[in-house]
């Protein structure tokens, strides 16, 4: 990895909420009622330069998931991992392993 690349990755990871807001803006164009959260190593403060930013989108428009993914991955330069879930999937799956302090809503 080049020093420039490492520096850019550290900046993205350190400013993860800025990246998450960028993702949220894109998602809200498709689903204005979606909720967007960040979780994982960046929230815990345990990231490395090879980490990504885990972003969870809770949407009732799950049929738009491919469109959401394409738009985000096309427009966002930062290393993000997009997770899309219905409210039911969030409550039945993600809530099983995410503690409240490990997930942050993007405002």
Regions found by a protein language model. Name each.
Residues 54-55:
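Structural signature of the urease/amidohydrolase superfamily beta/alpha-barrel
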């Amino acid at each position: 990895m080049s020093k420039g690349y490492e520096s850019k990755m550290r900046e993205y990871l350190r400013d993860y909420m800025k990246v998450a807001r960028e993702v949220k803006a894109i998602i809200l164009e498709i689903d204005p009622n979606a909720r967007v959260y960040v979780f994982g190593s960046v929230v815990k403060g345990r990231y490395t330069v090879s980490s990504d930013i885990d972003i969870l989108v809770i949407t009732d428009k799950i049929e738009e998931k491919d469109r959401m993914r394409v738009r985000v991955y096309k427009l966002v330069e930062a290393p993000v991992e997009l997770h899309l879930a219905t409210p039911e999937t969030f409550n039945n799956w993600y809530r099983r392993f995410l503690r409240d302090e490990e997930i942050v809503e993007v405002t």
